Amino acid sequence: MTGHAPLVGVIGGSGLYKLEGIEPVESLNIDTPWGRPSSPITLFKLPSGPVVAFLARHGVSHQFTPSEVPSRANIAALKKIGCQVIIAFSAVGSLREEIKPRDIVVPSQIIDRTKSAHAMFGEPFDTELTGLVTKSIKEAVTGFEMNDRIGVHAEKVAICMEGPAFSTRAESNMYRMFGGDIINMSVLPEAKLAREAELSYALIAQITDYDAWRESEEPVTVAEVMATIAANVSVSNRLTLTILDEVHNAVAKGQLKTCKGTMEYSVMTKKEMISEESKKTLSFILPYFS
């Protein structure tokens, strides 16, 4: 691997399979106790010099459905190569009139509607990181052409449902009553696993549609979603050029309180009662279990 470990990892969602406009310097195939990640990890050199890591959540050919994504391997591999922070992109549906297609949301909370078995936690997103990312995005979009069409929203609630699937109209309205603002299929278990690996995590959610709750519209179709995803990809690439420098510098200077050390006393089982095999597996991401 290159001499400088990447502090920041980027997970690309649907349509974002590489970072445009940034020089790729190395491709890594990382083996983890949970298998290989969904794509090779590509290291990109930012114009200012630092290296960042990128992987495609669904694979470079979008071969993994939301329920098939090897999230444990993805998170473990990014942790292994030195990442302390993850910026994840995802295509999402809007559950609110004021959050329009092509808008950007940096959520602060999640409601879990998946079938995963991980325990919930109080703050699924790093609050300092989401604040920095939101500020950086707002500054970036002011320079975009037709920037008035791209709203930026923070302090919103993401619903994560089991996928691949789209909501019925009744389900969509139920999620609105729950207090959800956006809906997707990928933020979990990703956010939970990032916390377990002591990685700060923030989601940049790009709106593709209004889900199915609007009575005045036909239910969302795959064609509709894919058309908006294509329009969002160029925005994603322009945002990465702006925000990755800021996030890297904040981590390098110690301005973000990362999650390092938060899991050391979070396992209730006495260390001597944990099997050697489990310790070996855990030590891949948490060295104090070795």
From Swiss-Prot:
Source organism, top-level taxon: Eukaryota
Site (Important for substrate specificity): 167, 222
Residues the record lists as binding substrate: 185, 209-211
Residues where phosphate binds: 14, 57-58, 90-91, 186
Main localization (coarse): cytoplasm
Broadest EC class assigned to this enzyme: transferase
Pfam family, one: PNP_UDP_1
One record GO biological process: purine ribonucleoside salvage
One cellular-component annotation, GO: nucleus
Pathway assigned to this chain's UniProt record: Amino-acid biosynthesis; L-methionine biosynthesis via salvage pathway; S-methyl-5-thio-alpha-D-ribose 1-phosphate from S-methyl-5'-thioadenosine (phosphorylase route): step 1/1
UniProt subcellular location: Cytoplasm; Nucleus
InterPro entries attached to this UniProt entry: MTAP (IPR010044), Nucleoside_phosphorylase_d (IPR000845), Nucleoside_phosphorylase_sf (IPR035994), Purine_phosphorylase-2_CS (IPR018099)
UniProt keyword annotations, A-Z: Cytoplasm, Glycosyltransferase, Nucleus, Purine salvage, Transferase
EC number: 2.4.2.28
Catalytic activity: S-methyl-5'-thioadenosine + phosphate = 5-(methylsulfanyl)-alpha-D-ribose 1-phosphate + adenine
An example Gene Ontology molecular-function term: S-methyl-5-thioadenosine phosphorylase activity
Subunit record text: Homotrimer.
Family: Belongs to the PNP/MTAP phosphorylase family. MTAP subfamily.
Function: Catalyzes the reversible phosphorylation of S-methyl-5'-thioadenosine (MTA) to adenine and 5-methylthioribose-1-phosphate. Involved in the breakdown of MTA, a major by-product of polyamine biosynthesis. Responsible for the first step in the methionine salvage pathway after MTA has been generated from S-adenosylmethionine. Has broad substrate specificity with 6-aminopurine nucleosides as preferred substrates.
Protein name stated in the entry: S-methyl-5'-thioadenosine phosphorylase 2
Species assigned in the record: Puccinia graminis f. sp. tritici (strain CRL 75-36-700-3 / race SCCL)
